[in-house]
Structure formats: structure tokens, C-alpha cells
Amino acid sequence: MMQPSTSTNSIRPVRTRIAPSPTGFPHVGTAYIALFNLAFAKAHGGEFILRIEDTDQTRSTEQSEKMILDALRWVGLDWAEGPDIGGPHAPYRQSERSDIYKKHAEQLIENDHAFRCFCSSEELDAMRAEQMANGETPRYDGRCAHLAAEKTEQLVAEGKPHVIRMRVPTEGVCQVQDMLRGTVEIPWTQVDMQVLLKTDGMPTYHLANVVDDHLMDISHVMRGEEWLNSAPKHQLLYEYFGWEMPVLCHMPLLRNPDKSKLSKRKNPTSITYYRDAGVLPEALLNYLGRMGYSMPDEAEQFTLEEMIASFDIQRVSLGGPIFDIEKLNWLNSEWLRALTPEELKNKILEWASNSDKLTAIAAAIQPRIELLSDAVNWSGFYFQNLPDINAESFTHKSLTPEQIMDMLQLSLWQLEVLPTWSEENIYATLKGLAAHLDIKMRDFMAPFFIAIAGSTSSTPVMNSMAIIGADMTLTRLRHAVDVLGGLGKKKLKKLEKQAAELPDFLAAE
């Protein structure tokens, strides 16, 4: 089996990429990986590109894609090619490249490197259940891998739904070359017969990223270390196609202060949250640049240009970098203090002067003010980070603290997965949940005024949630749950079960 090079001194021009999925909020982890891809490419006189991995059509949204692109631009990252600016390798959305993937999947079948799998989801579930009962690692057992060609053709002709899976060796070890780790050995017995093309004709990440990286001339793939165990599949696909494989570099994952994987349950993870909270883009990019990386002069404060000028990928530490909000706030304060008063004034105006947001706030407070100075009291909570609240703030004559915490947490989970953040969807969700829990709407909404505005005397709270946006709303709701004492593991598990049984409140509208 051919072995990819780990050298950066190749004749091949350096081209790196970031390929976010538009299925949620723009994650700081995306900016972190994008930053190191950009810095590496620029340090070697190369190019950094962006493409959108929107093969999950049930979860991908245009709103999410726009949020991701806007957030990455805001933090200071630019790309040479992408869905918003075009380029010689267009289109840059995977949903617009399905014919390309289908052609390559069929090529693999023709060369006997892949096969059609007709197993139903029920069969696959039963297979996994039996394997787990026997103490085995759940994986596809290859039952369709050796179907006779005539049988396969018959099932296809009958229109039986199927996927395309890749063939993998059943014995031996795959040697993966990684820029930070050297040679990594992964037994083929740990590698599943990966689905490459789904029943809807859309590719999985594994096929799409290999095909796109090749066709877009990507020389170095720098991604999170969670993809290391998938590298054998990708390496095998490059061999099957007869293509030169990009150099691999698996970056350490960002961690919470307790060393767990960075999670929105413990820390805000959205770029837009930090923007709305008042973190400078230069400071956030600087902080992400310090995640597992050190400058040659050990400087703590540096610009993107300074990082690129001295960039060396071997200075990345494999120890899980800790994303600590307190340290980010400290670094942001250093950037703020380095500004002149004039520069600080401009930064404040730039941060607070979102025209659409100000118009929405003005409409909300207009019926409530007599003097322009009244606007300060009515609109302050729209701009603050977290309201100054405590457990006593949530005292309610009809609801216990436990009830309040439960309904806030259930609401939080429901709101996290809204396909579009709008007042209409917020209203439908909360109204449906209140009815489901048999709580009067007035009583149900009272804790939201406290969690979002810090007071029961404020503008309409669902309108306020729409204005401050999903990231800030969800962060304030998580803060409220923490203020009320937080959820223990036993209670959390019980609530998760209850949440899984909730109906789709948007579908009921």
C-alpha cells in the first residue's frame, strides 16, 4: 500500500481547506482549525479555501451557512475560493456536486472496491444489538459484500433501496502517516465497511471529502484528531482511485477546563456568542492561535500576520488545549487596553451599531418610553453578556425551583435544534412545551423574563430572544439553569428521556 508523504517541501503547491457543515451555530472549533489551515498555507506561500459540507440535507440550512461564513470573516479569516466568492473548482457546496460523487462511487463498484448493500435499518439495528450482546464492537458484518452480480442487478432493477459501501481488508494493520504523530498503526479489524453513498444518492463525509480534496488539489488535510481513526478509510480510497494522498495532520481537540471535549453544555462554543458578548475579533483569533501552540518568542499577544510570519506546525502540542473563558477575557482586556481612546470608541460603536438589531430594539421599546433617556433602562439587557441574577430571582408563586429548572432545560434543548431562529418558531416551541407540561403560558414564561432580561419588567421576551439571537439566548438559559443549582447526572438522564419523547411542536403549527 502506498504511503503518503509527511513533507511540506513538496513540488506540489500548498493548498489547505476548511469544510464546515451548515447544521448549527459557527463553532469556535471551526475557527481554530481554519486558523491553523490558513496559517500553514500562507506560511508556505500557498492558498486556503473553504467549501461547505451540506450532504446532511435534513439538518443543513442556508441560515447556518451564512452565519458560519459571516463569523469566520468577522474573526479575521479569508479564503481564496469558496461558495460565496467562487473559484476554479466550483461548485463549493457538496449538495451541488452529487453527480460527481455518484460517478466516483460507481467507479469503485466497477473495480470491485465497493459493493451495494441492501440491508434495512431494522436489519442493521439487529446486527449491532447482537454484536453488542456478544461483547463485540458494532460494525457491518459484510453480509451483502459477496452477493452474486445477478442478485445485485435483480434487486437494483426491483428498486430496492440500497447504499454503496467500500470494501476494507479483514486482517493486517494500516499505517497512517501524520505530521504531528509520525506513523500511526490502526488494525483493519477496527475499520468498518463505510457507507460511501446513501440511499438518497448523497455521499457521506468519507467519499465526498476524498473526492473533493483530490479534485480541488488539496495538498495538506489539517483536521481535528477525532478523524484519525477514519484515516485508514480515506487512505484506502486514495489507493483505490490511484490518486496522490494529501499530507495528514490531526490537530488536538479543544477542551473544557475539566479536560472534557469542548461542549456547549459547559462553555459557550459559538463564535457569534463571543462577538455579541464584546470580544474583539483580534483577541479571539489570538486566543485560538494559542490553543496548543506557542510562538518562538513565547509571546502571548500576537496578530495573525505575526503568527503566519513565524509559523511552524511542529510547535503544535498534542496535549488537549484548554479553552478557558476567563483567560480569553483577560487576553481581550489586554487588547482593549492597548487601544487609544479613539480606537476604543470606534470599537464600541462598531460592536453596538448593528443597524438591524438597533431597529428591532427601537421597535420593541418605542411603546414604553417617554424620553430618549428612558431607552437606556429598557434596552440595556439587549447588550449585556449575562444578567445579574441569583436563585431568588426566580421565586414564583406557582412553580417550584425544580419545575423552573426542568422547563428551562427542556426549552433549551428544544430551542437548540430550531431549523431557523425566528420569533414565530420560538413562540410555537415554547407554547407547545407549556401546553405539553400543562403549565399556563403566563406562568411558563415568567422565568424566561428573568433568564433573558434579568427582570420581569421588560419588552416581550420572545421578541427579545429573537433580537439577541440564538447564541446569546441559549447561553443565558444555560446560565439560568446553573444559577438554579444545575442538573445532576441522575436528573439529567431523566430529563433527556423526557425530552426524547416530546413531539415536534413546529409540526403541530
Curated annotation (Swiss-Prot):
Its EC number is 6.1.1.17. Zn(2+) binds at residues 117, 119, 144, 146. One of its GO terms (molecular function) is tRNA binding. One of its GO terms (biological process) is glutamyl-tRNA aminoacylation. Binds 1 zinc ion per subunit. ATP binds at residue 264. Catalyzes the attachment of glutamate to tRNA(Glu) in a two-step reaction: glutamate is first activated by ATP to form Glu-AMP and then transferred to the acceptor end of tRNA(Glu). It is found in: Cytoplasm. The keyword Zinc applies. It catalyses: tRNA(Glu) + L-glutamate + ATP = L-glutamyl-tRNA(Glu) + AMP + diphosphate. The keyword Zinc applies. Belongs to the class-I aminoacyl-tRNA synthetase family. Glutamate--tRNA ligase type 1 subfamily. A motif ('KMSKS' region) lies at residues 261-265. InterPro entries: aa-tRNA-synth_I_cd-bd, aa-tRNA-synth_I_codon-bd_sub2, aa-tRNA-synth_I_CS, aa_tRNA-synth_I_cd-bd_sf, Glu-tRNA-ligase_bac/mito, Glu/Gln-tRNA-synth, Glu/Gln-tRNA-synth_Ib_cat-dom, GluQ/Sye. This is Glutamate--tRNA ligase. A motif ('HIGH' region) lies at residues 20-30. It comes from Psychrobacter cryohalolentis (strain ATCC BAA-1226 / DSM 17306 / VKM B-2378 / K5). One of its GO terms (cellular component) is cytosol. Keywords: Aminoacyl-tRNA synthetase, ATP-binding, Cytoplasm, Ligase, Metal-binding, Nucleotide-binding, Protein biosynthesis, Zinc. Its cofactor is Zn(2+). Monomer.
